[in-house]
């Protein structure tokens, strides 16, 4: 068994598709019309057959209170792996992305939290560089 799909709830699928592809760098994999919405997925360009992220419409009445509570408490909806959080934060800030948490080392990982403009906070994370001595002070 493996994870095939995961989703993020979005206010506007067109806006989300633009943000997740043109800003974050994912690529569109699937787009199937389903009435007023679409089955819309994106993937990492380096893993086009990997896990698909569904840009899921947030119309269900339970979604609003749930997402409001997460955002109010500063809790990310999901997390994406990056090679270097500091470099990725700088790249995204140059594109106008708003961060609610600047890069922060937390044990074995560095994280930062961004606003996806579609109603969610998203964490990016990378392993802390252990350095040449495995993390021991020089």
Task: State the predicted function of each range.
Residues 5-8, 38-41, 80, 89-138:
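Vicinal oxygen chelate
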Residues 12-13, 83-85:
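Helix N-cap motif at beta-to-alpha junctions
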Residues 45-50, 59-62, 85-87:
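Short, charged/polar surface micro-motifs in flexible loops or helix N-caps
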Residues 51-53, 122:
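Short beta-strand segments
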Residues 19, 86-91:
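Short amphipathic alpha-helices within nucleic acid-binding modules
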Residues 64-69:
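Short, P/G- and charge-enriched loop/turn segments at secondary-structure junctions
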Residues 8-51:
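Core segments of cupin and vicinal oxygen chelate
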Residues 3-4, 73-77:
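Eukaryotic phosphotyrosine signaling hubs
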